[in-house]
Swiss-Prot record:
It comes from Drosophila melanogaster. It catalyses: L-tyrosyl-[protein] + ATP = O-phospho-L-tyrosyl-[protein] + ADP + H(+). Its EC number is 2.7.10.2. Keywords: ATP-binding, Developmental protein, Kinase, Membrane, Nucleotide-binding, Phosphoprotein, Repeat, SH2 domain, Transcription, Transcription regulation, Transferase, Tyrosine-protein kinase. It is found in: Endomembrane system. This is Tyrosine-protein kinase hopscotch.
Length: 1177
């Protein structure tokens, strides 16, 4: 039966393989406008009719087919990749031009497991908008980008995009129509061009309302512009790209769905006139302009919320009265918006809606069906869930399908959100214990995470073809009984036909009845098989299409006030989601048991993140002592002390403190000797208030001194200098260096001073002395003998200060603090009186401060990275921040490690720019494991900064303090993994094109006089570009520039990859471009063996054995299915005499000549993206 393929009445254009655009225009603008078509769409012939935007016709399907089956068939027919299938859906089709503004438009979507109604007509549409639509969609799936153009064109002509409607956007609509005409003109065959002129059919490309209003004027203008652009037009592919680009930017809510329902309450709603908020916080409430009719809006009320729906099949619920509920709009704000999540807004006729966050999308873990029109959402943070009542059953189903698929495409691809409406394909994958199209690299990671046992396997769907599966199975144990022992993973192709599985294995095909049989027929070193099933917690990057590749930075000038931060009670932080860490700022505190680091407290609401200082307990510290410190500090409620915002209760145990922009006071004053007297008096005023707070609350601090006061504000123009008292730190004994801050009577028993509440008044006096002496002298270097000698001279432990820098009343206060009579040491009344007297007597005399460096954690000695681990806690999954320049910083998660080598580890992260209009950019961060190879690090930076070639990985930034290099991120990952896991789908033409990529990149390096010294598949990355792939050379850690003779002589023998090295490089450490050519030959072996290890046969027993056999003439065997000319090229690369090997320029010529200059990437059913001409913009 031909129903599933659209029947045999399709109009096929022999030259283009589709109905011509002009014919489609005629169909959509005349037949559909009147509610009919050439196929009599309202005639019920017992089939399901689905409109196809690509052909402009209705496809017919058997009525027993489920919605998901029809979607699958349409995707196959249109060449849409399996990974993109969930972006599409089936919706009821509008055959009217434009509904009356008083009529409720009800175009609902079908659930995947639902059967469609023969009485209705439907359309196949892209439903979900991927982030950065105009650029990312083409990279995900080129065919989807082409389909979107057809869909947008149809929606423009039928005026279904509210944001680009006449009359507001007359010029934009006209411009898009001209672009449409240019595309259609280029896609016509010569015969079609002879039969009709696109220029004369211009009215078919215009929205009808525009044509009716301006038919007299617009015709001549469009024809004139069309003729002008046609003479120098871009290619069809670039025109389509610009069309999609224009529409996506003019209509930012295109493919955004908005629902209407009734709820019982609005969480976090701000109630007017001081009646308080409903819910817990106002932080999630935000205002935004509502587009009253967003594209493809579902169940959106325009003016009358009780209007009757068109095509109103489906059960209806009586709309509750206002007293029984609240009518709201519901919308999912996507992950690339500033405040993503599920939001609601009261239905109102006002132009501005108040959108209120119900919950993060990833926090919605279930939808329960209450009845035919009502659901309850189970959401993290809402203990009793959140009920929604829709007007019809169809609306409810549309909402369930939208939210369920959105969550699959953003967080949990293997999960059905509503168990009342199951997805058939998910149930089948679950019953087969099979993964979706997760890709080979993610499969390898899963095998590693699950122990990497021999016999472990994963079965996954192919991400390029339908009905094709792969099995990734660990078959061999390599390097047994050594510290390098690991499993070899092999990948085999499986074709599914009905209920049977056809396995390609050992040069034959085996037809089997189950995947269990498939796993057991493949030979492995272990008889056992361990199947690794899919999990709802899997996060394969290939499938999470709605997660933005480049997140937008939080664009806001709003920030929490100091008063608001002071009011908040300390909280428990999740170190993974609430905090960002700056590992470059790490330092060891004076107590020796805690590390200090700068950080950011991430704010979920639309305000700036809060800068914080984090104090982390060392792994050998006592948690109870840490907890007692945090408990004491959490009770302090005074602005004179650094605020404790909260703490983490997971390793590393951390106190999250108020941030000090200028660091400790002693360092600040030492670097700012000209701080004026007024500023110092202002500073002292705050310190006196802090001491009074300690006295009133009977708190013994024990560490009052300038090094423990942190400067938070300095504004000489306003005469402000604020410093706050920090916590005393981890308990530790007093040392002799603490003597200036301890009463002399305790010099023989320093520890006894810790229980004396008057002892900190002595410390207060010494601290005032430090302040007014501008910390010129480090008092901690003074010995007790010196202090006692000075006290015997004039009664004070330190010399008197000159009255020019310290007024007499201030030094009188200092002497009171050093008095042996404890009752005279501190009187805040007397001190405030003295301060006021001094301020009244002197005039403000401020000098402009010199520029100073800011350091959030102070200037404590930064520890050499070789003395401690990279971080003072085990590998974790916290967000790390490294400042790069004044313009940007890099943020990464240690959990996102994507590679590890001898000298470094590579993480995935993103660049965040200070310019909030510039989106975040995904990058790879290569971080050295040890500082002992810092010379290599600087050399690698110096080399990478000079390189610019399409087959060389792009260098972006570097951070010397962190010893890390920031490079472009290539999602397809390492070439050696790609070879193994894409092996069944890798044909020789594709491999030859990769060989040419590498040769071109190496020719560029060779021309620059650069020797790579580590060329291998593991150091090559794969770049997925649209529907094609190319490769780029990376890892220049061993690279060197050659001398005038073309050689580089290594000075030391370190761990070297001998199986890729030429004999002269192994034996004499002499490297040249010719030794790179040898490595290129070995890399060719890796490629055409589909990822095999380059071992001699029989395998070498040692490095010496390997070298001896190479020198005796042995070479790697020819890989199976390797073309003759490629193995001949390998043999040339492995010539014993270096200068007899071909140069890379010669290699490029050999490959190009062999394939007659027509080496292209195979399409596997997909077309490569177009090349943009230089004059395209």
């Amino acid at each position: 039966m031909a129903l599933a393929n659209g029947g045999e009445d399709r109009m096929d254009d022999s030259s283009s393989g589709r109905t011509s655009l002009a014919d489609s225009a005629s169909l959509t603008n005349s037949s559909l406008r009147s509610g009919t078509s050439s196929q009599s769409i309202h005639t019920n012939d017992g089939t399901i009719r689905v409109f196809n935007f690509t052909t402009g016709e209705f496809e017919r399907f058997h009525p027993n087919m489920l919605c998901e089956e029809i979607c699958n068939t349409m995707c196959r027919q249109l060449g849409i990749a399996p990974i993109a299938q969930l972006l599409y859906g089936i919706r009821e089709h509008s055959t009217s031009r434009r509904p009356s503004p008083l009529v409720r438009l009800d175009l609902t979507w079908c659930l995947p497991g639902e059967r469609l109604n023969c009485q209705l007509v439907y359309c196949f549409r892209m439903r979900f908008r991927v982030p950065e639509l105009d650029s990312q969609l083409e990279l995900i799936d080129g065919r989807s980008h082409k389909f979107l153009y057809r869909q947008m064109r149809y929606d423009m002509r039928t005026e279904q995009i509210p944001e680009i409607r006449y009359p507001e956007h007359k010029d934009k609509s006209t411009g898009l129509a001209v672009m449409d005409m240019l595309i259609d003109d280029q896609e016509q065959s010569e015969d079609q061009q002879a039969m009709r002129s696109i220029e004369k059919l211009y009215k078919l490309y215009l929205p009808p309302s525009l044509w009716r209003a301006h038919s007299f004027f617009v015709g001549s203008k469009i024809r004139e512009v069309f003729r002008s652009l046609k003479a120098n037009s871009l290619s069809v592919e670039r025109l389509k790209w610009h069309y999609v680009h224009q529409v996506s930017h003019l209509a930012p809510t295109y493919m955004t769905e908005q629902f209407t329902c009734t709820v019982q309450y609005l969480p976090n709603e701000e109630v007017a006139r001081g009646s308080g908020p409903i819910g817990t916080s106002l932080a999630h409430s935000t205002s935004t302009l509502a587009s009253s009719g967003s594209t493809n809006t579902l169940s959106t009320l325009t003016t009358n919320t009780n209007s009757v729906a068109l095509g109103g099949s489906g059960k209806k619920a009586k709309r509750r009265s206002t007293s029984g509920g609240i009518d709201v709009y519901v919308r999912v704000f996507p992950h690339d918006s500033l405040e993503p999540g599920l939001k609601v807004a009261r239905v109102t006729s006002e132009a501005t809606l108040k959108w209120i966050l119900v919950g993060a999308v990833e926090g919605i873990f279930m939808i329960s069906k209450i009845n035919d029109t009502s659901v309850r959402l189970e959401i993290v943070g809402l203990p009793k869930g959140y009920e929604m009542q829709f007007q019809t059953e169809k609306e409810m189903k549309s909402f369930i399908s939208y939210l369920g698929i959105y969550i699959r495409l953003s967080s949990k691809w293997m999960q059905d959100l509503c168990h009342s409406y199951r997805t058939p394909s998910l149930e089948e994958l679950s019953s087969l214990h099979c993964h979706g199209p997760i890709g080979g690299a993610y499969s390898l990671m899963k095998l590693h995470e699950n122990g990497d046992k021999c016999g472990s396997y994963i079965v996954r769907e192919c991400d390029r073809e339908y009905n094709i599966y792969y099995i990734d199975i660990n078959t061999k144990i390599m390097a047994k009984k050594t510290d390098q022992e690991r499993c070899k993973t092999e990948t085999f192709r499986i074709v599914r036909k009905d209920s049977q599985w056809k396995l390609s294995y050992n040069n034959g095909e085996h037809v089997l009845n189950s995947l269990h049989e498939v796993a057991h027929i493949i030979q492995a070193d272990s008889p056992d098989r361990y199947r690794i099933p899919a999990s709802k917690y899997d996060k394969p990057p290939l499938l999470l299409l709605l997660l933005p590749k480049n997140l937008k930075a939080k664009k806001t000038d709003l920030q929490l006030s100091e008063a608001e931060l002071q009011r908040r009670n300390p909280q428990i932080f999740n170190p993974r989601t609430d905090l960002q860490w700056y590992p470059d700022s790490i330092s060891l505190s004076d107590d020796g048991m805690m590390f200090t680091m700068r950080g950011d407290w991430i704010q979920q609401s639309p305000v700036k993140d809060v800068s914080v200082t984090m104090k982390m307990l060392k792994s050998d510290g006592n948690f109870m002592e840490f907890f007692r410190l945090a408990q004491t500090w959490s009770l302090i409620q005074s602005p004179q002390f650094l605020k404790l915002y909260g703490l983490t209760l997971a390793d590393p145990y951390t106190m999250v403190m108020e941030y000090s922009r200028y660091g400790p006071l002693n360092k600040f004053l030492h670097s700012m000797p000209n701080v004026t007297l007024h500023c110092l008096l202002d500073l002292m005023h705050g310190l006196v208030r802090g001491m009074h707070y300690l006295e009133d609350n009977k708190i013994i601090h024990n560490y009052i001194r300038c090094s423990n006061l942190y400067v938070t504000k300095y504004d000489p123009n306003s005469y402000v200098l604020d410093a706050k008292i920090s916590d005393p730190g981890y308990p530790r004994p007093y040392r002799e260096s603490d003597s200036p801050w301890i009463p002399v009577k305790y010099y023989r028993n320093l520890q006894a001073a810790k229980t004396d509440q008057f002892a900190q008044l002595w410390a207060f006096a010494t601290t005032i002395y430090e302040i007014f002496s501008r910390c010129k002298e480090d008092l901690s270097t003074l010995r007790q003998e010196q202090l006692l000698r000075q006290k015997n001279l004039d009664g004070n432990i330190l010399k008197m200060l000159d009255q020019d820098i310290c007024p007499a009343p201030i030094f009188e206060t200092i002497m009171d603090g050093w008095s042996d009579d404890e009752t005279k040491r501190f009187s805040h009344h007397d001190i405030f009186s003295r301060l006021n007297t001094i301020k009244a007597e002197i005039l403000p005399n401020y000098m402009p401060p010199p520029e100073i460096a800011t350091n959030g954690t102070g200037d404590e000695t930064v520890i050499d990275r070789s003395d401690i681990p990279f971080l003072p806690f085990p590998r974790s999954n916290m967000l790390m921040v490294i400042p790069l320049t004044s313009e940007c910083r890099v943020i990464y998660n240690m959990e996102n490690m994507i590679g590890r080598g001898h000298y470094g580890t590579v993480y995935k992260g993103h660049l965040e720019f200070n310019d909030k209009d510039q989106p975040r950019e995904q990058v790879a961060i290569k971080m050295l494991n040890t500082m002992q190879v810092s010379t290599d690090f600087h050399r690698e930076i110096g080399i990478m900064r000079t390189l610019s070639h399409p087959n060389i990985v792009k260098f972006k930034y570097w951070a010397e303090k962190s010893h890390c290099i920031i490079m472009e991120y290539l999602q397809s990952g390492s070439f050696d993994i790609y070879l193994r896991f894409t092996a069944p789908n890798l044909n020789n033409p594709r491999l030859v094109s990769f060989a040419l990529d590498i040769a071109n990149g190496m020719k560029y390096l060779s021309d620059m006089g650069l020797i790579h010294r580590d060329l291998a598949a593991r150091n090559i990355l794969v770049d997925h570009n649209g529907d094609g792939d190319c490769v780029k050379i990376s890892d220049f850690g061993l690279a060197q520039f050659a001398n005038s003779d073309g050689y580089y002589y290594a000075k030391s023998k370190r761990d070297i990859p001998i199986r890729w090295y030429s004999p002269e490089a192994i034996s004499t450490c002499r490297f040249s471009s010719y030794s790179d050519v040898w490595s290129y030959g070995v890399t060719l072996f890796e490629m055409f063996s589909r990822g095999e290890e380059p071992n001699l046969v029989p395998i070498q027993t040692s490095q010496e054995d390997f070298l001896n056999r190479l020198q005796s003439g042995e070479r790697l065997n020819r890989p199976a299915s390797c073309p003759d000319f490629i193995y001949d090229l390998m043999q040339l690369c492995w010539h014993a005499t270096p200068r007899s090997r071909p140069s890379f320029a010669t290699i490029v010529d050999i490959i190009t000549r062999e394939v007659a200059t027509k080496v292209t990437h195979p399409t596997d059913g997909h077309q490569s993206p177009p090349n943009q001409p230089t004059d395209a913009e």
